[in-house]
From Swiss-Prot:
Sites where the protein binds substrate: 21-25, 33, 37, 65-67, 69, 71, 188, 194-196
Full protein name: Ditrans,polycis-undecaprenyl-diphosphate synthase ((2E,6E)-farnesyl-diphosphate specific)
Record field: catalytic activity: 8 isopentenyl diphosphate + (2E,6E)-farnesyl diphosphate = di-trans,octa-cis-undecaprenyl diphosphate + 8 diphosphate
Keyword Calcium applies: no
Gene field: uppS
Domain of life: Bacteria
Organism: Vibrio vulnificus (strain YJ016)
Length: 251
């Protein structure tokens, strides 16, 4: 096996990111929290572009947790409007680059206008064959497992499955990202070291990388640092950030 092939196979297939620190970043600049959220959109663009260059199979971004509804009403409203704006402005670019966009979570609580934008964005990119971008919105890991178990329970109630025969696979195939590899690498920004009810099942064996960088300051260099750490730690395959940059340039 060529070293380059071994190196490529050592990269994570599925990266999950908890995009944290927008509010604190904005506060450090003397700006309102929404300023940080808007700046965070730029970080999303940079991160998606870098991951796509590396042929990462899937990236899942934790945009809005089911607990975020507890935030001030004004901030939640601004986040929903920002979500609509970003979907409207970015989805055509994603489609042009053969990227597939999926919104993961209970979208029923969103406004009809936002739900319509979500459906349109997913339908436009559904046939694309490049990297899958999952945006977790109104998502919680406990919710994901619960809705999967409910579907299994329905099978039992219908007599299609006995309770004694339920396996992990029976539950896993009903999770929201059942068609993707489990998460190899979790990245959380802003220095917080917890997973905040994010992809509890899918991250069972993930390596977890915590960086003090606030999300608005995260970009290609930050992603390279995280992936370099992952490759050296998880695969025991010595590499440098320069090697990863070279791989990106070769794509």
């Amino acid at each position: 096996m060529q070293n380059s092939q071994l190196f490529t196979e050592s990269l994570p297939k599925h990266i999950a990111i908890i995009m944290d620190g927008n509010g604190r970043w904005a506060k450090s600049k003397g700006q309102p929290r929404v300023f940080g959220h808007k700046k965070g959109v730029s970080a999303v663009r940079k991160t998606i572009a870098a991951a796509s260059k590396l042929n990462i199979q899937a990236i899942t971004l934790f945009a809005f947790s089911s607990e975020n509804w507890r935030r001030p009403e004004e901030e939640v409203g601004l986040l929903m409007e920002l979500f609509i704006t970003v979907l409207s402005s970015e989805v055509k670019k994603l489609h042009k680059n053969n990227l597939r966009l999926r919104i993961i979570g209970d979208t029923s609580r969103f406004s009809e206008r936002l739900q319509k934008k979500i459906v349109e964005a997913q339908e436009l990119t559904a046939s694309n064959t490049g990297m899958v971008i999952n945006v977790a919105a109104n998502y919680g890991g406990k919710w994901d497992i619960t809705q999967a178990v409910q579907k299994v329970a329905q099978q039992v109630a219908l007599g299609d499955l006995s309770a004694e025969d339920i396996t992990e696979d029976d539950i896993a195939k009903h999770l929201t990202m059942s068609d993707l590899p489990e998460v190899d690498l979790l990245i959380r920004t802003s220095g917080e070291c917890r997973i905040s009810n994010f992809m509890l099942w899918q991250m069972a064996y993930a390596e977890m990388y915590f960086t003090p960088v606030f999300w608005p300051d995260f970009g290609e260099e930050s992603l390279i640092e995280a992936i370099t750490w992952f490759v050296n730690r998880e695969r025991r395959f010595g590499c440098t950030g320069e090697q990863i940059k070279a791989l990106m340039s070769a794509q």
